[in-house]
């Protein structure tokens, strides 16, 4: 099962190829304990594709019958954020592969952002340049999300990317 945003459907075969060859191709961006992220070139774009940890037996069943996969939720939440005018990497697609028991593999693809840093860098470095201003703007951003009905339940330092805009704002 998969879904590709209309804007990227002309590249369906390339995107499917990135997924099917994920283990053997792409540029490794993050290798975590649970998930891996690789970068793939698609014409002038760079796609960021996250491969989620293969679920255990119970979660295979849960993700088949009771709960959407992490890849699908990432795609749907990013799409909702975009619809609300909240900055997030442009969602491209999600893919789910099932076996006879349930969910086997899942992938989420989005446009890769350049010149960004993780909120973690600000939290860990009290001397980070413009730290106080970034924290004020981050607080304002979080409040605006809440006002738009978004309750970000996983606001961990690694889940938030920050970019400096041309006007000097973050």
Where are these regions (language model features)?
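Conserved ATP-binding subdomain of kinase catalytic cores across diverse folds
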Residues: 15-117, 143, 147
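Broad phosphate/nucleotide-binding scaffolds in NTP-utilizing and phosphate-metabolizing enzymes
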Residues: 1-13, 89
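Catalytic activation segment of kinase domains across protein kinase-like and atypical kinase folds
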Residues: 158-170
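Conserved kinase catalytic-core helix
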Residues: 71, 80-87, 120-158
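Short coil/turn linker and secondary-structure boundary residues
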Residues: 10, 114, 126-129
């Amino acid at each position: 099962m998969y879904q590709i945003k209309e804007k990227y459907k002309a590249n369906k075969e390339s995107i499917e190829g990135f997924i099917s060859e994920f283990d053997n191709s792409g540029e490794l961006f993050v290798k975590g304990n649970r998930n891996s992220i690789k970068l793939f070139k698609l014409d002038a774009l760079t796609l960021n594709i996250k491969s989620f940890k293969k679920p255990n037996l119970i979660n295979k069943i849960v993700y088949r019958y009771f709960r959407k996969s992490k890849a699908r939720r990432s795609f749907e939440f990013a799409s909702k954020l975009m619809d609300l005018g909240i900055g997030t990497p442009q969602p491209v697609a999600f893919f789910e592969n099932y076996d006879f028991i349930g969910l086997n593999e899942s992938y989420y693809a989005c446009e890769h952002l350049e010149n960004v840093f993780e909120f973690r860098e600000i939290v860990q470095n009290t001397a980070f340049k413009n730290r106080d201003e970034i924290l004020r703007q981050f607080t304002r951003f979080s409040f605006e999300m809440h006002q738009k009905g978004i309750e970000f339940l996983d606001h961990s330092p690694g889940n938030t990317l920050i970019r400096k805009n041309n006007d000097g704002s973050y």
